[in-house]
């Protein structure tokens, strides 16, 4: 066996070990990143579920107080309005409000003016970033 082939084998072995070490580090880092992103996702889900529950509870109470039937799609409309308000699109807010039945417009205005809802939505957007 010549010295050249021995050196080549040693270099090849070292390269393989180095590559395996890098793969281990990458796998460990991706595992940590995966756990962190999952925790963030679960945080977003919890915040959005809490917002949805509050909107639905307030909508049901509003419908009972006014004596009007509950509108199942009001939760999604409230979410859209919160998002538009957070982004600052006042013109589009007016367009969406025109599509809602008149008896529900006061409720949606209350939701948009509710500072707690706005801060929760802002918190949700911060978690996403």
UniProtKB/Swiss-Prot annotation:
Domain of life: Viruses
Keywords: Virion
Any one annotated GO CC term: virion component
Main location: virion
Subcellular location: Virion
Role according to the record: Self-assembles to form a helical, filamentous nucleocapsid mesuring 400 nm in length and 20 nm in width. Together with capsid protein 2, wraps arounds the DNA and maintains it in an A-form. Capsid proteins probably maintain the DNA in A-form by non-specific desolvation and specific coordination of the DNA phosphate groups by positively charged residues. This certainly protects the viral DNA under conditions such as the extreme desiccation of its host.
Subunit-level organization: Heterodimer composed of major capsid protein 1 and major capsid protein 2.
The protein, known as: Major capsid protein 1
């Amino acid at each position: 066996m010549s010295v050249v082939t021995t050196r080549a084998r040693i270099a090849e072995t070292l390269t393989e070990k180095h590559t395996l070490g890098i793969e281990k580090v990458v796998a460990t880092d991706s595992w940590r990143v995966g756990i962190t992103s999952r925790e963030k996702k679960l945080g977003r889900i919890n915040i959005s579920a809490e917002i949805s529950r509050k909107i639905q509870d307030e909508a049901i109470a509003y419908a009972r107080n006014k004596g009007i039937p509950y509108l199942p799609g009001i939760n999604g409309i409230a979410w859209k309005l919160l998002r538009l308000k957070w982004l600052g699109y006042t013109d589009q807010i007016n367009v969406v409000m025109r599509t809602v039945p008149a008896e529900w417009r006061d409720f949606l205005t209350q939701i948009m003016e509710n500072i707690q809802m706005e801060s929760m939505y802002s918190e949700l957007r911060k978690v996403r970033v």
